[in-house]
């Protein structure tokens, strides 16, 4: 498969270093194997797993490479549209990052570092461990609530923080009972859990999303499910399914020891600010201004592989 020849025929003005950067990105998405065909790009879940661990700028570069090669080979339009939706969302995220980086007075007043949020999680963890829960059959309400706080704190410090999509959420162990309109913790076994997200902001363009659960969070959830057998992942004070609004309030309450008013949006902004190369993004904005085109056009022209 002559990728370079095909890309040059489709994009004759594309520089060699750009093409080389695209080929490097594609090879990485193909498990560092030489590319014999483009079938691996149809495995959306595998590609998503590889992208999830990358920085925003790198994700954009890789998806740009995917789109360039798919278009060069006149690939399936639905597959091209799928990756176009991803790049559009990444561009939207970029715009959000740039706007949020200029903090409002309210954000500035409540801004903290991720390390402060982690301190709250560690403090709750110490309290839970002191309860010796593994040797107890039932919990009193205060201990039960503290355990759920531990779960919620883990959801938003041990994972890149998504929105309030963990509530409402069902716990399900049979895939046949999972529909395409609700959110689930799929419990396939002690070490076989994933979050299945159907209802979220961009569900119309991206469809069902599957979130892997890291080992530490998996252990916390195992402990939680030992005492929570309701079939609902998170609960309100009446032991009924927690709402998204209730989860938002719980997050603010749980992180109150920081002395700040931590909302889900602020929490996400803090995470982004510490995990995205703002200097590189600002440089892109400045370059766009110097070249008299918009950042959106800048993103569509060329993404340098980092």
Question: Language-model segments: what does each one mean?
Answer:
Residues 4-90, 265-269:
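Non-catalytic DNA-binding core/recognition domains of DNA-processing enzymes
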Residues 14, 293-299:
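Short, basic interhelical loop/turn and adjoining N-cap
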Residues 79-135:
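Flexible interdomain linker/hinge and immediately adjacent N-terminus
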Residues 118-164:
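Basic, Lys/Arg- and aromatic-enriched nucleic-acid-binding interface segment
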Residues 146-149, 155-178, 278-282, 291-292:
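A short, glycine-centered helix-capping/turn motif at helix boundaries
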Residues 168-215:
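Conserved tyrosine-mediated DNA breakage-rejoining catalytic core shared by Y-recombinases
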Residues 210-267, 271, 276:
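Active-site/catalytic core of tyrosine-dependent DNA strand-transfer enzymes
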Residues 266-294:
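C-terminal catalytic core of tyrosine-transesterase DNA break-rejoin enzymes
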